């Protein structure tokens, strides 16, 4: 989110920006730690491009990805937070050649596990901040999931708690590069899809939540 990047950028020290493949990477220090901050763009390709550039060009050793997602569980409501235990690509489908749905060829995995240490740290940070949150599977795909039928299918197939468009691509890049990774998502809509929100108002609140979690996480590691 642009708003979240702006919040964190304003708190960074010795910040400089490099643009690679159309993505702005902000390099500096935050809460005493060297960080690289970027807004990848929408979809799995941009997300993977951003993550791979962070690893190869800027030498990051961990990645935490934040953003918004739709809830797939009645335990998470608008403004709550989902933390990944694993990510899946719900639109990956090679069942025509005998594979199970969601299988990523080459690495032969469906679930891309989050780093348990980072996920546990984010869990503790959210608890300390009194943010309602759940750990679970986050499902990603290059489509905006807006029908009840698709949501029900994703839950029944992958037991996912939230759905969005980027996290699993970053998880795959991190897995093949052996980089610890976890994702956090602020919930933007209810499981039923019935509750409507003012998007710009929500984005500001979501950015405040996710940037606060990021800062608390960095402070806890200082």
Short names for language-model regions:
Residues 1-52, 57-58:
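N-terminal short beta-loop-beta anion/metal-coordinating cradle
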Residues 53-57, 75-76, 171-180:
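Alpha-helix C-terminal capping segments
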Residues 60-64:
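Proline-aspartate-enriched helix->loop->beta-strand connector
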Residues 72-158:
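Mid-sequence, gly/pro-rich, charge-dense loop/helix-turn segments that line enzyme active sites
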Residues 117-132, 173, 209-220:
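Generic non-transmembrane alpha-helical segments
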Residues 144-192:
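A C-terminal functional module that forms or caps the active site or interfaces directly
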Residues 191-222:
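His/Asp/Glu-rich mid-to-C-terminal helical/loop segments that flank catalytic regions of hydrolases
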